[in-house]
Swiss-Prot record:
Protein name: Flap endonuclease Xni
Region (Interaction with DNA): 185-190
Family as reported in the entry's similarity comment: Belongs to the Xni family.
Cofactor note: Binds 2 Mg(2+) per subunit. Only one magnesium ion has a direct interaction with the protein, the other interactions are indirect.
CDD domains named among the record's database cross-references: H3TH_53EXO (cd09898), PIN_53EXO (cd09859)
Binding site for Mg(2+): D105
Gene Ontology molecular-function annotations: 5'-3' exonuclease activity; 5'-flap endonuclease activity; DNA binding; magnesium ion binding; potassium ion binding
Classification via InterPro entries: 5-3_exonucl_a-hlix_arch_N, 5-3_exonuclease, 5-3_exonuclease_C_sf, DNA_polI_H3TH, FEN, HhH2, PIN-like_dom_sf, Xni
EC number: 3.1.-.-
Amino acid sequence: MNTFLIIDGMNLVRRMHAAQPNENDVNGLDIRVGSACKKLVKYHQPTHVAVVWDGDDISWRKHLFEDYKKGRKPMPEALSNTLPALKSYLAEQGVNSIDAASEADDVIATLASKLVANGGKAIIVSTDKGFTQLSDPYIQRWDHFNQHYMTIEEREEKLGVEHSQFIDYLALAGDSGNKIPGVPGIGPKSAIELLRTFRSLANIYASLDKIGAKQAKKLEAGKQMARLSYKLVQLQTDIPLNINLSQFRLPNPNA
């Protein structure tokens, strides 16, 4: 079975860089990132490995909702400037890159989903909670910084909803980190209670007559925001990749 180690490049690099006291200090970053990738390969023993990077194009999510990820601190210029050299260094170490047009998340989700559909296995190295929605047991998530697999049970316990309700939950409660609006007036606690009672976003909106008048009014007024938020949260798993897996095969996975 092909096992593809898919590394979320900016998730890894920005967190490693954030540990530096001076954001303009990128000395040795290539060696540290290269060492991290080498450890990941040694531990997981994949047949293929790639680092997927965000691109410069405006995300389709930003076109859909202008406030998407609004207010996020921009990447330090020194870090941005060193990325080409970092990618070259990783390639010299046998770890090739995939450059997304905009957000890497959809490329990662598509690659993982297509691998599994063709009998493979994917290990996504990222702490991004958005990958929680990828439910196939042959798609695993690895937290490099805490050195453990992030399980469905762990995420369910943290959110208070079932794995299958993850997107519905964020469509209702929103996500402040990504500026996903959710339904105004429906916070995490209310979203959990609604999903425990009605099981899904569709069922909630089909049962407004069974919900208290005040809450039903909020839900009705925020229906379009719920739909928008659902679209923003949902990962695309069918975008064109135009890659050849042989580019990312490791010559000796046991090395």
